[in-house]
Amino acid sequence: MNKLNIAGQSVIRFADIEVLRYQIDGFEALPLKRKLLVYHLSQSTFAGRDIIFDQNGRYNLRIRHILETIYTHYEVARETDEFVALEEYLYRVWFASGIHHHYGCDKFVPNFSQAYLSGIVEGLQREHALLLEYSEDELADIYAEIFDPTRSPKSTEQSGEADLVEASSVNFYDRGVGQKAVEAYYQALQDEADEDERQAPPSYGLNSRIAQTADGTLYEQVYKQGGLYGEALYRISAHLKDALEYVDTEMQAEAIKSLLAYYRTGNLKHYNDFCIKWVQDTAVSVDFINGFTEVYADPLGLKGSWEGLVHIKNPIASERTDKICREAKWFEEHAPIDDRFKKAEPKGISASVVTVAMLGGDSYPATPIGINLPNADWIRAEYGSKSVTIDNIHAAYREASRHNGMDAAFIADAEVRALLERYDGLTDELHTDLHECLGHGSGQLSPGVSPDALGAYASVNEEARADLFALYYMADEHLLELGLLPDADAYKACYYRYLLNGLVTQLVRIPLGANIEEAHMRNRALIARYALERGKQEGTIELNGLDLKITNYEALRGYFADLLREVQRMKSEGDFAACKQMVERYAVQIDADLHEEVLKRYKSLNLAPYKGFVNPKMTLRYEGEAIVDVELDYTEAYAEQMLRYSREYWTLPLNPVQEERLRDPRPSAKTLEKAKELRAKLRHSMD
């Protein structure tokens, strides 16, 4: 395969998904030591694959196992409509790491019947008894999870109309556990914190699942070696230990050692240690994410989804982000927010443009284009943050979208299309830089305000805050002075694209009649609809049908400034009520007529609204017993890769939570009290 044609190349398309390839430019030129660091970090990324499947739903590993067994062993009538539908369902399960849509959160509707599935399973059980060792009761339960529309309809519920925990099927909480009980549990932990924990608060609940005893007492099943997901964490840790031999810096080695201690013990203090060392290590060329990181999938915003990612710094492109970081204090001082909420001295803000080398967990197959970590506000305030803009993912998306007809279909004004053609690629990446590097790194909480005060609305608030910061500064003359934009018109491309996406084009991803659910989509809708409301009042923005017109871009910047000021206030003061009201007003409901027209126009283009990626296959080349190279293969197909990952990186039992209960059964409070009484009687009789 000609590697020059790899970026953005289509691998397969199914349902509402198109799978692409990305290219690791410059990998061949790396020294062997650095290639081996990438290799071992990548292996640790693959080893966590089963974790994200189980976190996304308690039946996912069993469903994946059954479907993969059928896919690889059922050899009769594979051309029928029902088998093709079953194949597509499996493809969707692979992509979403579960049976719910990776963006919309709704459960997939199978286009094959339960009778068809059960017939195949029964046949395979007769012919290959050891392949599918499930009882009739177990299979009935699994079939109900797949086919019953009233059961687990949504992975993450964010509507606020019901108990968010009970209404969500993500596997962070036992069935029957309610939102108020969880909030009380973690509030008690915060109230009982000692002085050290108050000074350096752990991210309560990040690496655990909430279970309950027979009498309803809550307790944590901690993700650690010897605990829940222990088998996977042992294997992840083994590859991290292998990586220690090839680290870029001594600080990177120390960070990995803290991460290993965290996986070994489950102690969140070790995770804080890891984050502090990781964020201070800015000299690395090869860096990584590995852990229970983002909390978007948890309706309460506490539980981290397992994620792995490896990337290589692009030193030339990073000159752009270096300029931004050096000016962090200037940007903070000039931000249009209340001075009380500004950082007095922004610390440790670093940013790079990177080439992703491997994706895993919550970042695979769908992946972000930019990342800013760590998430703990106190670490960001005291030690800073690291941001990355992922250039080869940007490039793959750009290549895949060339001449796809979207702009011609949704932008009537030829001058606007020309504006976007000229500046879009540049402003898109710069907006990501500003969002990740400065947006997430800006502002501070008022004294005594909990970082969890905004609850289920925290993720939308945080993404809106970062986007607004980037949008506001995109039009600033300071970017021209820094040489980051070519002229004073470039920012208009960013503004137009952002509003068009938030008001119109992102709706192609949502089924007619549904609400906006995903945090990033809600954020974009909130900002764009607020701006449109202001623009209508002042005659600066119009939306006639699907035709967007912006007549005063300077006024639009003012709207962004006003909204940023309020969004920052909500976070800094922990104003849950105001945040909820704003999100529910601007970011959830969709006008049905507009939505129908968007979908009709989009359908004519025959495009897939969601995209993701297969990874390059990375293998060691030996001469004798010596490793002489790490080679990349860009030819692996989608199903081929998914089946290989299941063969080579299956680390967990089919029902990890059940296995954990058998390993660590928790008695009820009543049982403990009886045991206490018996011990007292025994001591008394011995006396």
For the regions a language model picked out, list residue spans one by one:
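Short, glycine/acidic-rich hinge or "gate" loops at secondary-structure transitions
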Residues: 250-257, 271, 449-452, 479-497, ...
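Contiguous, non-catalytic segments that form substrate-binding/exosite surfaces or channel walls
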Residues: 91, 99-212, 219-417, 424
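Post-HEXXH active-site segment of zinc metalloproteases
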Residues: 443-464
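An active-site-proximal "capping" alpha-helix that borders the catalytic cofactor pocket
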Residues: 31, 249, 459-476
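Long, well-structured alpha-helical subdomains associated
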Residues: 23, 52, 58, 80, ...
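Extended, compositionally biased alpha-helical segments that mediate assembly or anchoring
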Residues: 556-687
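N-terminal-proximal low-complexity accessory segments that begin disordered
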Residues: 2-72
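Short alpha-helix carrying the canonical HExxH Zn2+-binding catalytic motif
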Residues: 425-438
